[in-house]
Amino acid sequence: MEPAEQPRTSPAVRAHHARARLGASLFFFLNGFLISGLLTRLPEVKGLLALTEVEFGFIIAALPVGSIAAAALPAPLIRRFGAAAVASAGTAVLALVFTAAAAVAALGPGAEAGRSPGPAGPAAWSPAIPWIVAALIALAGFLDAVVDAAQNVHGLIVEQARGTSIFNSLHAIWSVGSVTGGGLGLLASTLRIPLWAHLSVSGAIGVGLALWAWRLSGPNPFASDRTGPAPRKRTVIPDEDDSGETTDATGTTDATGTSAEPGRSAADARPAAGTTGAEETGTPDGTSVGDTAGGEAARPASSASGPDRSAAPSKWALLAGVIALGLLGAFVEDLGMNWSSLYFSEVGGVGVQFAGIAFVVALTGQLIARFTADRLTDRIGRPGVVLSGGVCVTIGMLLAMGVAQPWAVVVGFFLSGYGSATFIPTAYAAAGMIPGLGHGMGITLASWALRIAMLSSSPLIGLTAGALGLRYALVITVVAGLGAIVLAFTPVLRNVDTGRR
């Protein structure tokens, strides 16, 4: 006998969604936590390995190089094993790789000077050790790219199953994890806890929480892009909206109360016994949630469901626009994270002891926006959120550049951090909802492009500052804000918007 159908508002379904959201949140938290734990103690790595500045630069570069090398690998992994499984396994291995890197670094010649000796002591020194550390850091970058794509896919799956936005707050939780990991790293360094001991504890925490996050998500959670040897049926969580119509997890509606997929009844949409109650398997071609095996989004035949798909932009045009939005966000965030303190000091005219205020207010604005943007997304939709963010960035950077007084710089960078906070999460979410592209492929390509952008943004800002002066280098972020405003009026976001349910 099939289990009784449960509406999305039932206590069992709400509890399931709460567990899944907690699992997704843990993935994002751990990703920020693990990486920042190492980054805060990189100077000790330099000392342990007795590196020159040039050699240290190559060690640091290994992380982004490894992440870019991952290229499109996350997509097939997600389709084969499921997003939650890939995120969990990748996070656990990432934690172990960081631990291994710290243990190997502790064998360096710097330990002879009393710098955090490892369990094997300095006698185990070999000229190959710096190369091994660089290889491990490159592997960490590779794994981070895989985990980044998988956790974003899983977060989007949970969001679509819930029917309400959570994507911005998930990215805010990544920031909380980063601050937590960095704070613990700073505390460990202050207490002179050896690097290998610190990262061993962090690694154990990472492995344990990654496995727990997977258990919270279930072995094949929600609408993962996992595929088997043959296409399998898509199951849908029914949802009663205010009109009494039933809406599936992707937002498509049928007035008869059945799922929007032709030939499917409400009984077909019920989960099979033993499933999570919200599981959806993909198709062999990796089409996204709501897509049929042929690649077209599942929709009612009625024209009331939206414009004709043939009139919509191609999936590649949509992907290009989504990536463009992410690139704009990367440039604005890079300015706030890496250049705000210098700008406040040199252009705002404050002492170096107060220069960090600009960084703090930019980060504060970003966190506030990400924790509050989900509710706003549900109300006005993703295009409206991006539009308002673009306006904030444009006004804030014009204020900081035009007035260039301390108060104006502080207000300007707060508005910039607040406004740009939703650009990258929105780009990830939109990339995962492009019809005809699987979650894994869309988000993987967007993530890969963003990593390249983050490598190039600071040099471009530096070149602009060298040509025009640091004050007028902010013109790049003004252009980014205007670009976001333009994108908000294009089909790029309207075609994949899930707000205003």
Residue ranges of predicted features:
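Primarily marks hydrophobic transmembrane alpha-helices of the MFS/SLC 12-helix fold
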Residues: A84-A87, T91, V386
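Helix-to-loop junctions at the C-terminal end of transmembrane segments
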Residues: A69-A83, S189, A369-G381, A465-G466
